[in-house]
Amino acid sequence: MTYDNGTTLTVAGRTYTIADIDSIVVNSRPVTAGQVEVSYSNGGARVFMAGDVAPYLTASVSGAHVSITAAAGLTQEVNYVLSGTSSDGSFTQTGSYKMRLTLQGVDLTSSSGAAINVQNGKRIKVVLADGTTNALTDAASGSQKACFYVRGHAEFAGGGTLTLTGRKAHAFASGEYTELHSSLGHIYVASAVTDGFHVGQYFRMAGGKLTIAGVKSDGIDVAATNHSTDENNGQVMISGGTLTIALDAAHDVKGLKADSLITISGGNITITGMGNGQKGIKTATNLLVNNASGTAPTLTITLTGTTYNKGQADESKTRGIKVDRDFTFDGGTINISTPGPKAKAIVVDGTYYYKSGTINCPVSAAIVG
């Protein structure tokens, strides 16, 4: 700590104007190097920064709404650890270097915007601390894209649980790819005004548990970016874990939707719905189901609806699986029930290639290879 000419005070590399300081609190609380701890309570929030990263970070706290901006000169990964509860709080991070976000028993409901808003285009590793329960709810109004938004690419890990409630739009959204690692515990989408997960570039699930319910649009929607050279652009890749999507009574929606290839090589997928015109799985290109992960996948789809807007320009028929190009089935088990009028289990506009596995439903294909 340096006191200079009675006008400034420098602490841990940051200089403050004396006239702007109304109090100084000194305590013995340790903060791990490279870490920022944000502790919420209904009355507000407190931010604790490690000395090695404090010079590069600027924090703003208004009630329990916390915003932290990382300077361009930051060249180390910071771990932001959120804990505590607030019925009117949020967390926003802005920066340009990869970071870690640890949810360590945090419960936030925002009255203005997203509950968590990461305006950082780099890799964001989200860790659900083992044994913790976390919950996020955004405001019912505002311009936010999701309750939990990541501008860059998100990677989820950690054995805790996270419940998301999207009151304005999506429950979770990322501008670039999203991955669920094998160490993941459970992410539960309780409800969303639009999609449960809305992901740019690609979605990869290697393990853990993802449950999506109460959505008024698609369960998982993966959109290709505008850059055709982006890796796995528009794809879905599922090699493990348990994915459960309940579309409920929403009409003309999809459980799992992708702009490009969907590859399912492991895991257990269950999709249910009772609205009209629903699609359990919908790909704009090809579908590949095999056991390349070493464990054969199981797909169970039950859609009880019929045709949406029958006879209209936007008519949509119920389909368990709809493939715009080719479908290759080479391992696993597929069970589909679509008992409604005009509904079908699997429709393939291109070629259907059967190699191995158990499929307990009819396949309607333009060509059988």
Each model region followed by its residue ranges:
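Compositionally biased alpha-helical segments
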Residues: 1-29
